[in-house]
Amino acid sequence: MFSPGQEEPSAPNKEPVKYRELVVLGYNGALPNGDRGRRKSRFALYKRTYASGVKPSTIHMVSTPQASKAISSRGHHSISYTLSRSQTVVVEYTHDKDTDMFQVGRSTESPIDFVVTDTVSGGQNEDAQITQSTISRFACRIVCDRNEPYTARIFAAGFDSSKNIFLGEKAAKWKNPDGHMDGLTTNGVLVMHPQGGFTEESQPGVWREISVCGDVYTLRETRSAQQRGKLVESETNVLQDGSLIDLCGATLLWRTADGLFHAPTQKHIEALRQEINAARPQCPVGLNTLAFPSINRKEVVEEKQPWAYLSCGHVHGYHSWGHRSDTEANERECPMCRTVGPYVPLWLGCEAGFYVDAGPPTHAFTPCGHVCSEKSAKYWSQIPLPHGTHAFHAACPFCATQLVGEQNCIKLIFQGPVD
C-alpha cells in the first residue's frame, strides 16, 4: 500500500514535516539486535508526498459471502462486519486528500508502517521470544491531518494487504444509534492520556479502549471479553504529547514535536553522564573511582560501573561480599547503613523520549537499576501499564521490568561531590 520511500518524503529545498514520534516502551534507545527498517524502537511519522488517508463512504448490506468478497475486492479500502452467516455489513472507504494514514502491527507486510513485536521485560534478548504473540498483525491505524496543527487520531485495527478489515462473527461489534457499525479487536487497543500533558507536573490518566471507528469506551472486564465497555462521550481518540498506546504485548509512547523540543536530547544525556563521571564518584568502601559506561556500551557491565543498594540508595563499586539471604542471590547488606536489599549495577536511561524533564540522573528504578531524572522516575513509577490480559503495574520505561518497593524508585547517594 505504501512504499518505504514514502515514509520520509524529501521535497526539494524543503524539510519534510514531521507529524509526531512513537517510542516503544522497554527499549533503551534501540532494539537489542539493532533497529532495522520498519522495525525499530522509535518511529517518526512524516507527512507523505501524497495523501494516504481514507474516510468512510458507501455502506452495503450483503447476504452472501460471495457478495461481501466482491465488494471487498474492488480495490477500495473496506471494513466488513459479519453479523451472521447470512448477513454482513461492508463499509467502503474512499481516498481522503486531507489526511495521512500510518499503520502499526506485528505483520511485516507492506501495509504496516511500524512493525512491533511483544516486548520482553528486563531487556532480554529478542531471541527469548513469546511463543504466541498477543499483538494483532494489523493492530491499529493513526490518521494525521495534513494541515496544521496536524491533529492525530487513533483507531483500532489496520487494513491488510487486500485493503480490508474483517470483524468476524465472534468479534465484539454493534450498530450505533446513528446507524453506523463499529467494533473492537480481539485484545483491544488501549489508550491513556496523561493529565496535564507529558511534563514534570503530569499525573496518570485513565486507560480507555478505542474502537475500530475511533470512539472511546471504558475497559472491558478482560481484554478479549465479548461485552464492550461504556461509551465515554466526553473523550476523543485524539492523541496528545505523552499518550500511551497499548497493543496487548507492546506499549507505545506518543511524542509531539513541541514536547520533544522541550525534552532532553541524546547529547544532553551524554553530557550529564560525562558530568557525573568528571566529578569522580567513589566507592565508599574500596575508594575506587566509579564511572557510568558509554551509552554505546550499555549492555556490558564494566569494571568501574556504579552499583547500588536499592533499599537505601547508597552507590558502591562491585563487591562479592555482604550476602544476607540464602534464597535471594541478589540480597545484600549495605556496609554504610546495614540495610538489606537488592544490589544491582546502575544503567543510564538513554532513551530521551521517556524523560519528562532535563534534570540530572539522580534516581534509579527498582529492581532494574536504570537511572534517570527524579521527576521522570517519579512519573513512570506511578503509571499503571497494562500487563497480560487484565493486570496493570508500573514498569521501567527503559526495560519494561515490573517495579517493586515502596516508591518503585530510589534516590541515589553518591560518595563525593556529585550528590
Curated annotation (Swiss-Prot):
Keywords: Phosphoprotein, Transferase, Ubl conjugation pathway
Enzyme Commission number(s) from the entry: 2.3.2.27
Catalytic activity entry: S-ubiquitinyl-[E2 ubiquitin-conjugating enzyme]-L-cysteine + [acceptor protein]-L-lysine = [E2 ubiquitin-conjugating enzyme]-L-cysteine + N(6)-ubiquitinyl-[acceptor protein]-L-lysine
Gene Ontology cellular-component terms listed: cytosol; membrane
InterPro entries: Pellino_fam, Pellino_FHA, Pellino_RING
Pathway where it operates: Protein modification; protein ubiquitination
Molecular-function annotations in GO: protein-macromolecule adaptor activity; ubiquitin protein ligase activity
Post-translational modification: Phosphorylated by IRAK1 and IRAK4 enhancing its E3 ligase activity.
BP GO annotations: positive regulation of MAPK cascade; protein polyubiquitination; regulation of Toll signaling pathway
Record domain FHA: where: 15-202
Top EC class of this enzyme: transferase
Expressed in which tissues: Widely expressed both in embryos and adult. Weakly or not expressed in spleen and thymus.
Job of this protein: E3 ubiquitin ligase catalyzing the covalent attachment of ubiquitin moieties onto substrate proteins. Involved in the TLR and IL-1 signaling pathways via interaction with the complex containing IRAK kinases and TRAF6. Mediates IL1B-induced IRAK1 'Lys-63'-linked polyubiquitination and possibly 'Lys-48'-linked ubiquitination. May be important for LPS- and IL1B-induced MAP3K7-dependent, but not MAP3K3-dependent, NF-kappa-B activation. Can activate the MAP (mitogen activated protein) kinase pathway leading to activation of ELK1.
Record comment regarding domains: The atypical FHA domain contains a 'wing' insert and mediates binding to threonine-phosphorylated IRAK1.
Family the entry assigns: Belongs to the pellino family.
Assembly notes: Interacts with TRAF6, IRAK4 and MAP3K7. Interacts with IRAK1. Interacts with BCL10; this interaction is impaired by SOCS3.
Name of protein: E3 ubiquitin-protein ligase pellino homolog 2
Gene name per UniProt: Peli2
